[in-house]
UniProtKB/Swiss-Prot annotation:
Chain intervals for the UniProt region annotation (Disordered): 1-22
GO molecular function terms noted in the UniProt entry: hydroxyproline O-galactosyltransferase activity
Function: Possesses hydroxyproline O-galactosyltransferase activity. Transfers galactose from UDP-galactose to hydroxyproline residues in the arabinogalactan proteins (AGPs). Is specific for AGPs containing non-contiguous peptidyl hydroxyproline residues. The addition of galactose onto the peptidyl hydroxyproline residues in AGP core proteins represents the first committed step in arabinogalactan polysaccharide addition. AGP glycans play essential roles in both vegetative and reproductive plant growth.
Protein name: Hydroxyproline O-galactosyltransferase HPGT2
UniProt record, GO biological process: arabinogalactan protein metabolic process; protein O-linked glycosylation via hydroxyproline
Coiled-coil spans in chain: none
Ranges annotated as biased composition (Polar residues): 1-10
Pathway, per record: Protein modification; protein glycosylation
Taxonomic placement: Eukaryota, Viridiplantae, Streptophyta, Embryophyta, Tracheophyta
Top EC class, one word: transferase
Length: 345
């Protein structure tokens, strides 16, 4: 019986140790549980990051495939169309060389009834409001009707040169058409708008139209305020027949006017250098170009630069070609000398 307390006491010790171990294992279980949660969270994030990386790689690969390639100079030229343009330029140069060898002629031009090449085409500038001036010329130095035809048989063509109205087909155009049907002495520039500010461009259209319609030795531009000594002009041109590259007129140069609003103001004055002086050129009242120079204007009309005035415009074209400048005092229409072939009307 004495041993019983010992047994009871041992059982109590075991229960105490069990409850203590039970109390100790609860935090461990909780820690283990949270460790599992943390592991699952980390594993989930790692998996999610892996998915993001895979998606990012896919996007990068797509962008890489779609990004512009590094182009060589040749590739860039092809993309810009320069290669095709270069080919067309070469073809055009070959066509131009062939045209030069044939005298620039695009088609057979009119010749006199005798079969000889025309001596000259004389274009007299006119405007819509110049009907009285035209009649004055027809009654003085300019032949009309049968006399005009006989002059053409001698190799000289004279035409009034005019463009079209800004309002195509209006009363201004109709009056010119009616007058031309009666007199047959107009060269109508269909692609040119007749206006004061368009005069420098008119020169291109005149020489182009004249070259395309008549095969002549010379092409003469005359203002409508000039009276011609026609026989004197013919004699002057005959003396220069077959002279290539002839740029003939009353040569001059002068100051470039820079003051806006002045009568002779040149908007592009800064292109004429610090001295602001025009190059030598023929006065606009009367300008003569030989056949090859007029044909040069015809071929390059789309590229030729125009300035504020037609005389300096023509002079600028002549600087870039092999032109022979012929300063003939007989063509100084405003001078007082006796031996001249023109005078101010």
């Amino acid at each position: 019986m004495e041993s019983l307390p010992t047994t009871v006491s041992g059982k109590s010790d075991r229960r105490g140790r069990f409850s203590k171990s039970q109390n100790t294992s609860k935090p461990s279980l909780i820690l283990a549980f949270f460790s599992c949660l943390a592991w699952l969270y980390v594993a989930g994030r790692l998996w999610q990051d892996a998915q993001y990386r895979a998606a990012l790689n896919t996007v990068l690969k797509m962008n890489y495939d779609q990004r512009p390639k590094v182009l060589t100079v040749e590739d860039k030229l092809v993309v810009l169309g320069c290669k095709d343009l270069e080919r067309r330029i070469v073809e055009t140069e070959m066509e131009l060389a062939q045209a030069k060898s044939q005298g620039y002629l695009k088609k057979q031009k009119s010749v006199s009834s005798s079969g000889k090449k025309m001596l000259a085409v004389i274009g007299v500038y006119t405007g819509f409001g110049s009907h009285l001036k035209r009649n004055k010329f027809r009654g003085s130095w300019m032949p009309r009707d049968d006399a005009l035809k006989k002059l053409e048989e001698r190799g000289v063509v004279i035409r009034f040169v005019i463009g079209r109205s800004a309002n195509r087909g209006d009363s201004l155009d109709r009056k010119i058409d009616e007058e031309n049907r009666a007199t047959k002495d107009f060269l109508i520039l269909e692609n040119h708008e007749e206006a004061q500010e368009e005069l420098p461009k008119k020169v291109k259209f005149f020489y182009s139209a004249a070259v395309q319609n008549w095969d002549a030795e010379f092409y003469v531009k005359v203002d409508d305020n000039v009276d011609l000594d026609l026989e004197g002009m013919i004699a002057l041109l005959e003396s220069r027949r077959s002279q290539d590259g002839a740029y003939i007129g009353c040569m001059k140069s002068g100051d470039v006017i820079t003051e806006e609003g002045s009568q002779w103001y040149e908007p592009e004055w800064w292109k004429f250098g610090d001295d602001k002086s025009y190059f030598r050129h023929a006065t606009g009242s009367l300008v003569i170009l030989s056949k090859n120079l007029a044909q040069y204007v015809n071929i390059n009309s789309g590229l030729l630069k125009t300035y504020a005035f037609d005389d300096t415009t023509i002079g600028s074209w002549m600087i870039g070609v092999q032109a022979t400048y012929i300063d003939d005092n007989r063509l100084c229409c405003s001078s007082t000398r006796q031996e001249k072939v023109c005078s101010m009307a």
